[in-house]
Amino acid sequence: MKRRIFTYALTLFALSASAYDITDLKDLPDHPEKGKWVQCIKVEAPRIHADLTTATPLSFQAKGMSRILVRCGKHILTPEGVNLDSEGRGRVTLNPKKLPAGPINIQIIADNAKKECDIYELQLWNAATKTARTEKGMPKDCPAVAKGMKLDFYDDFDRGLSISKDGRGARWNAHKPTFGDFSGWPFCDPSDDTDGPFVLRDGYLVIQARKKPGTRGSTGLLAPVDMDGKGYWVTPPFYMECRFMAQSAPGTWPAFWTITNIHRGPGDELDIIEAYGGWGEKNPNNTGYFTTTHYWEQKDENGKQLPGDDKLIKTDKDDTSWSQDFHTYGVYVDKDSTVYYRDGLPVHIIATNAMSFENKHVFLINYAIGGASGWQIDLERYGNRSNMYVDYVRVFTQH
């Protein structure tokens, strides 16, 4: 896990305040790459991580902006635009009956003629409806890629959470075994605090990143192996997947990944998804996510460090990103190929390294905030609060 340095075109879904046809998101204009990102959007209500129980006004200010789009996943909430007053204040009614149940992310996207732009992601919980979210919960069927395999491990977070500070006596370890925690806001032990790193709600594991005044902050990591190396390891061939959603904001760094070695020395690391949040100067400005393969401390035939593999998986305009909605991220490993998946479809394939096939893997799920990524942390306008919502994780194997 380390910082990725990259520059990509910045994609902004920006709409004028007048009426328009939004039947196809591909028709929405791209924002110029050299747009100036500014933090101008302020949400006045509802509060961050609030429950929606009835129709609720979304009140915000986007001073200096002229074009606004408000969306929830693929749902466009402002089909007739947003009228802003002279101070840039706007108001949109959030109707929970028209939104998915459970965790949702409301995106407010703004720009102006000066090419200034901003994106604000408001995480809420729709508690007013039982409207099914597509594919919510762990499917009963085996995914096509795992046909012929058996379900070897799963957690759908419907049965309580068994986790301890070192993994001993529990299903989950709250730290990376056996060394190497890497988050700027530290991965912390489980606690009964309502703002602690782990909370279960309605079949979701909520990993809560928080920074209270006077603290270094806190966030969460899960690994099914304890500090003695005991627990769940999977032997190739295997397929594993995890379904989650997080927030894109400066410093957020959700990931689902595997390692073959929990001690120092040679080992492979498969980053099934490594996502970097945040827009603007000194931020990733990334509309996709990475699949990354590391071959730690391994030499090629010339005695040089064996190069890894790094692939940006871009999010199309007519799709949703890792912060806009839930998606399932997976990896299949056999002797010949390592194939990365998103929502059951292959997105990247490489030849399997010998160490990946000949060794067992342990997987990790985490919501890092800054740290080894190298990206700045700036969650002040979110009250230094951000959540990652994990629906389930499961592993299939031939053994």
Which sequence ranges carry the predicted segments?
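GH16 jelly-roll
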Residues: P96, T129-H399
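Short, compositionally biased P/S/T/A/G/V-rich stretches that sit at domain boundaries
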Residues: Y20-D51
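Aromatic/hydrophobic beta-strand junction motif of beta-rich domains
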Residues: A50-L52, T56-A62
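Edge beta-strands of extracellular beta-sandwich domains
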Residues: E116-A127
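Conserved structural position at the C-terminal beta-strand
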Residues: I108-A110
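Aromatic sugar-binding surface patches on proteins
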Residues: L84-T93
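Surface-exposed, short loops/turns at beta-strand junctions within beta-sandwich domains
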Residues: L94-P103
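Short proline/glycine-enriched turn/loop motifs at strand-loop junctions of beta-rich domains
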Residues: Q61-R67, V333-K335
